[in-house]
Amino acid sequence: MSLPEIARGSEHLVLFDDQTSEVVKVTLPGTYGDYYEIIDGRISQFDSTPAEYLLRMRWWEKLFSTAPDPLGLTESGQILSRQKFISGEPPQQEEVDQFLVEAGAEAVRQKCWLWKMADVDPESEIWIGDARSDNFVLAEGKIIPIDIRIWGVPIPTQGR
């Protein structure tokens, strides 16, 4: 079965399954997204591993209930996932920012689309990156994340 391509980004090829009204995401070869940390006051970017990519989906589902479902791997190690196609309009960035605040997030570097949530995990802050308006959709009066990056940043232990 051949599915039509509807988008291609820095991380995924996105195909549309007309029979199920779902998108199929295929990571680009050797690409599993990235994450950020602030080191010496500067944002530093790191490549994610396949395990971190899959963990992202778990956090995404726990926090927002809209994550893609992982399906498996291609022979070349690309991760396949399915996600319900959500029809809607692109929200304004201010609406996305307000959605994140209402979800319990606080801006780390808002102009860099970088947020965090404390009190979700006892050992880590959960960071949300790439929270740009084009990675969300406004449908039925709700903001829905459709392509975000989520990772844990360990909480420093006091007294070390």
Please give the residue ranges for each predicted region.
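Short secondary-structure junctions
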Residues: M1-E5, P68-L71
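ATP-binding glycine-rich loop module of kinase domains
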Residues: S2-E61
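Charge-enriched interaction surfaces
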Residues: S10, G41-R42, W60-F64, D69-L71, ...
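Generic beta-strand structural signal
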Residues: F16-D17, E75, A131, L138
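Catalytic activation segment of kinase domains across protein kinase-like and atypical kinase folds
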Residues: V26-P29, W113-R160
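A short, polar/proline- and glycine-enriched secondary-structure boundary/capping micro-motif
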Residues: G33-I39, E94, P154-G159
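Conserved structural core of kinase catalytic domains
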Residues: R58-L114
